[in-house]
């Protein structure tokens, strides 16, 4: 089965080139080679094109300049997925990267006829990959729709194309975009494969959405509104 890696991108306050380059370098060394990369770019400038040009002869890359819904992360992620053609679609956020050079191979080999999506283990770095901490092994909990995230960011998920053909990231959400889609997919397609290998590193930095929200004086009320919306959408 051919794989697609869907990457939504933007400027990240001047660090977008650095982050995408780091991610591409971990893609280049993957042992599994039957994949494409799709970049959906919300940047107002064209600096990320230089990174794409640098790697375009190393693996198959499709670059899409997305001028719609600027600043809406779920919409940009959906656009990246929409342009994917693989049998399995692996979501990767621009500021995260693969921790294991066999990550794609392990994800590919784990898929079967009984399961339609997968979540893998992850760790975290605050110093751009010099040190790693907090290995998180995904598990389900019934409060995930209330924002109790025991899985991690969307960078740990992969799904068969038919899943994303039917279910999209909810474009009205920010902080709950991951928990909501996990709940939605499980409700329709059943349990994921829980791959308890650490395959992805989540980069912790000041410009990531969770950091910006935590620094906002309205963060609690904004999150509460999103949680109530998700409960109304799925439980009422």
Tell me what each language-model feature is:
Residues 2-4, 36, 180:
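Cell-envelope/extracellular polymer assembly enzymes that use nucleotide-activated donors
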Residues 6, 134, 138-223:
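Conserved nucleotide-sugar donor-binding catalytic segment
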Residues 12-29:
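Short, well-formed alpha-helical segments that are part of the catalytic scaffolds
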Residues 24-65:
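Acidic donor-binding segment of Leloir-type glycosyltransferases
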Residues 33-34, 57, 84-87, 113, ...:
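Active-site acidic short loop of glycosyltransferases
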Residues 67-84:
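Glycine-rich, basic loop-to-helix element that forms the pyrophosphate-binding segment
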Residues 86-97:
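Short beta-strand-to-loop acidic/aromatic patch adjacent to the donor-nucleotide binding site
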Residues 97, 102-132:
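Conserved donor NDP-sugar-binding/catalytic core segment of glycosyltransferases
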